[in-house]
Amino acid sequence: MNIAFSFKNFEPSEHLKKYARRRMEKMGRFFGKASGLEINVVMTADKIRHRCEVTVTGEGLHLNASDQTNDMYAAID
């Protein structure tokens, strides 16, 4: 399982990076042993909102989810 992170309009703290990685690894276990599983996470910060977009791709699998809120940790969840 490969996890790639992209950040737009802000510099993430180490704690945020670790938190996001833990959440994505936890989510990855729901896909079992899907081969070639890749998770792409894009986090964007604007003046009053934070957005997290997650794309999961694998063999015969393509999922996309996003959320926006005023707290990046809540958007990741």
What annotation goes with each model-predicted range?
Residues 1-77:
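N-terminal, polar/charged subdomain of small-to-medium soluble alpha/beta proteins
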